[in-house]
C-alpha cells in the first residue's frame, strides 16, 4: 500500500507552481517576478502569490531548500542550518 491509498499523500500542486519550481531549479542568478511572469505568460500577482506560498511551505516543513527573495529576485538556496553538511559534501568531492 502506498501513501496515495492510505490518504496521506501530499496534495497535488498547480501547473503554475510546478513550472515556477522548475525554472528556479535551473537559474544561475535570482529571477525577478517580472521575468518569471513573462516566461510563464502570467500576471505578476499570480507568480508572486505562488512564490510566497512556496516559500512559506518550504519553511513550515523544515525543508533543506530555502526560497529567498533578494533585491535581484527569487532563487533556491540551501538552508543555513545545513551549511556544515553541504560544505563537507562539496569539500570531500563526494
Give names to the regions the model predicted.
Residues 39-41, 73:
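Short, charge-patterned binding micro-sites
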Residues 54-94:
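Short basic alpha-helical hairpin corresponding to helix-turn-helix/winged-helix-like nucleic-acid-binding
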Residues 32-39:
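A short acidic, leucine-rich amphipathic alpha-helix
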Residues 26-32:
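Short capping segments at the starts of secondary-structure elements
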Residues 18-22:
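Pre-recognition alpha-helix immediately N-terminal to the DNA-recognition helix
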Residues 43-53:
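Short amphipathic alpha-helical interaction segments
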Residues 1-16:
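Phosphate-centric recognition/catalysis
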Amino acid at each position: 500500500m502506498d501513501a496515495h491509498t492510505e490518504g496521506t499523500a501530499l496534495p497535488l500542486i498547480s501547473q503554475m507552481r510546478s513550472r515556477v519550481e522548475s525554472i528556479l531549479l535551473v537559474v544561475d542568478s535570482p529571477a525577478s517576478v517580472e521575468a518569471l511572469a513573462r516566461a510563464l505568460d502570467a500576471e505578476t500577482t499570480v507568480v508572486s502569490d505562488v512564490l510566497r506560498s512556496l516559500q512559506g511551505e518550504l519553511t513550515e516543513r523544515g525543508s533543506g531548500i530555502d526560497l529567498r527573495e533578494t533585491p535581484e529576485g527569487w532563487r533556491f538556496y540551501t538552508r543555513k542550518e545545513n551549511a556544515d553538511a553541504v560544505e563537507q559534501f562539496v569539500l570531500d568531492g563526494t
